[in-house]
């Protein structure tokens, strides 16, 4: 079993009743099954532990990143946009991340996790959408990463598990922002840190074209939106 999976097996709990979970690994050391004490099992698909399945409010994000899986990765687009934003938000140097156990909340396709992994951190990324599967594929070259599909309101981790928890550009997309935020501090170690940011929606900024367009496109079916984009 890889080191990240050994760590994960010690901190995982059932997100619905908070009881410990048992993980089973194959001969290569990869987790292949997760079971609760009450006999409930959760699938492990393409390396992703899936506590959700089915559809949810984040489906559009998952579909978006399935179509454009590497768009935001610095390693793909040749920029340092993700790196600069990530380290700027954390106010840390990359060397300070080495060896830390990090929780990426709303990991998307892994744009920020990639930076942390390159710095030598151990990263667990969680996303409510199918983007978790995209992150697992994008970052499979890293043996210190594990993706989970789960709910920010029902985190599958014991209290005080992580050295660092970050949630960047995610909270404003959740149905209940306050509840989402309050779910994060309990999983941070007493000596750890939590970094959260959000989009500042001043009245003036809401008049921008992208927000006006979003009011329209958010009501359209995905295929309709894509057809419009192709024409434009």
Mark where each language-model region is.
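Conserved N-terminal segment of class I S-adenosyl-L-methionine
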Residues: 1-156, 164
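Short catalytic/ligand-binding loop motif for oxyanion handling, primarily in non-cytosolic enzymes
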Residues: 111-113, 174, 202-207
């Amino acid at each position: 079993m890889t080191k990240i999976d050994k760590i994960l097996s010690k901190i995982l709990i059932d997100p619905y009743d908070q009881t410990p979970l048992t993980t089973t690994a194959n001969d290569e050391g990869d987790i292949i099954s997760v079971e609760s004490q009450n006999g409930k099992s959760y699938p492990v698909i393409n390396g992703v532990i899936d506590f959700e399945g089915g559809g949810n409010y984040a489906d559009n994000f998952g579909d978006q990143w399935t179509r454009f899986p590497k768009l935001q990765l610095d390693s793909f687009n040749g920029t340092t946009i993700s790196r600069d934003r990530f380290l700027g938000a954390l106010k840390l140097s990359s060397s300070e991340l080495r060896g830390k156990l990090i929780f990426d909340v709303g990991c998307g396709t892994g744009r920020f996790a990639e930076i942390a992994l390159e710095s030598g951190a151990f990263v667990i990324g969680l996303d409510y959408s199918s983007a978790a599967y995209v992150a697992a594929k994008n970052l499979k070259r890293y043996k210190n990463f594990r993706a989970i599909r789960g709910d920010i309101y029902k985190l599958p981790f014991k209290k005080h598990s992580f050295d660092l928890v970050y949630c960047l550009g995610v909270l404003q997309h959740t149905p209940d922002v306050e509840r989402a935020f309050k779910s994060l501090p309990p999983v941070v170690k007493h000596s750890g840190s939590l970094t959260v940011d959000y989009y500042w929606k001043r009245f003036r900024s809401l008049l921008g074209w992208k927000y006006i367009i979003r009011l329209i496109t958010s009501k359209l079916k995905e295929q309709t939106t894509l057809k419009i984009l192709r024409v434009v």
